[in-house]
Amino acid sequence: MECKVHYFYVLLCKDSTFYGGYTTDLARRLNEHNQGIGAKYTKLAKRRPLQMIHAESFATRSEAQKAEYAFKQLTRRQKETYLRTHPSVTLPNGQ
């Protein structure tokens, strides 16, 4: 059985909003979002291009999706604090 790494990630949109999501492949998912084939929120041209600014790895899909849900419940200010205080894995765009 293959052990996949599950990620919660955060994108910074061109309009300065944040988008949080879940994936098992950070580079593929960022590419999908930037091509307009990602989530409905990121399909709008005014939000692209998107930059991946944060990602955390988890052992299970459930843990990653719980982190995504918790992030989406935060206010903008709380999201900014979260991003400053939680470590991120190496991102596909080299950050």
Question: Residue spans of the language-model regions?
Answer:
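A short linear hydrophobic-aromatic micro-motif
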Residues: K40-K43
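GIY-YIG nuclease catalytic motif and its immediate N-terminal context
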Residues: M1-G38, R48-F58, S62-K72, R76-R77, ...
